Each structure stands twice: as C-alpha cells, then as structure tokens.
C-alpha cells in the first residue's frame, strides 16, 4: 500500500507533497517478518525511504514504539497541526482484544481515538473469517477454509522449495493457524472476523 501511495504522489500535478509515515511497531507482525524488537520496522523504513528518494518524493519515516492494547500515547505519534492525516490499519485490529475477551474493549477505544483525530481517510485491511467468537469446531472449519485458500494462492506464486514460501508458511501462517485453533481467551491473539461484526 505504501509503495503505491508513494508512486501515486510522485506523479501528482504540481509535484509531490511532503510525506511523513509513522508506523507503530506491532511486535506480532514484525517479529514474524524476521525483525523483532523494531528490526522489521527499521527494514520497512529503509525500503520506503529508498523508494521515496527514487521517486523524488520528500519523505520522512518515523518508527513509533509498540503500544500495548491499553495504552495509546498521541505524543509518540507526533501528529502536527495542519497536516492531512491518514490512518491505515493493515492486519492490525484483529490482534486487539474486543468485548468478547475483555470488558475494557481496547479495539473500540483505539477506533474512538482515531475518530477524534478527524483523519482525512482511514483504510482497513483484515482477513474475512469468523475466528473470533466461534466455538472450537466452527472455528477449526473456518480456519481450514480460509487458510486452504491462502495456501492455494501461495502455490500460484512460489514453488514449494522457495525459501520465501517456507519462511512465510513456518513463521507466519503456521503460528497464526496454531493460535486460532489451539488457544482460547487471552492467549488467542488471532481473532479474525467477518465483515459487519
């Protein structure tokens, strides 16, 4: 998504605006990507910076420390008056506990906070699967159906011997599947939902 945005801004009539991307380190995502402790976030920042330079887009990358589900510190995000704010939730919200796990409902709290910032645009990308509140057997069937499609898609693009494929399957998908099927309560952090929930 960021690559496409940078490329689109580069072609904007009148020249590209200054772009500042602040990414919050989601330990679950960046650890599975091989980074851990902000390492993956650093790699993403380097790649985006190189791309922006090659497209002549004035660019600033700000990594923000990971935040627990209950603490959102706006000062760490360095939101500046007068700037157009966009919020991108790419595979993030399903990691946050909702009212089915805790009465605190950190997901709702985060969404209300984002709304209070009056962003120009909010994008949301999540898996479409009923693996949040379903009982074990229906959740197992949902996971089987969803991940069968994911593996079929991977088959099209990567050979079975591909190191990238093996890494994704072992470090991302396998961990997610085990968490969805074998964990309950607070231990389950993969909580995919269907649209409209």
Annotate each PLM feature:
Residues 15, 25-197:
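Domain-level detector for long C-terminal conserved domains
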Residues 19-22:
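Short beta-strand element of Class I
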């Amino acid at each position: 998504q960021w690559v496409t945005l940078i490329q689109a801004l580069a072609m904007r009539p009148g020249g590209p605006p200054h772009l500042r991307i602040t990414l919050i380190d989601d330990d679950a995502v960046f650890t599975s990507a091989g980074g851990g402790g902000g390492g993956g976030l650093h790699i993403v920042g380097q790649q985006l910076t190189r791309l922006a330079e090659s497209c002549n887009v004035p660019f600033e990358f700000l990594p923000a420390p990971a935040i627990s589900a209950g603490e959102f510190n706006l000062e760490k995000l360095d939101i500046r008056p007068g700037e157009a704010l966009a919020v991108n939730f790419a595979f993030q919200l399903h990691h946050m506990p909702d009212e089915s796990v805790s009465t605190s409902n950190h997901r709702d709290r985060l969404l209300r906070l984002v709304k209070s910032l009056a962003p120009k645009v909010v994008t949301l990308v999540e898996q479409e699967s009923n693996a949040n509140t379903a009982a074990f057997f229906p959740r197992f069937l949902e996971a089987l159906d969803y991940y069968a499609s994911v593996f079929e898609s991977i088959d099209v693009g990567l050979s079975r011997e591909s190191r990238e494929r093996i890494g994704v399957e072992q470090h991302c998908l396998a961990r997610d599947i085990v968490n969805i099927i074998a964990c309950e309560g607070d231990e389950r952090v993969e909580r995919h939902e269907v649209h409209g929930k």
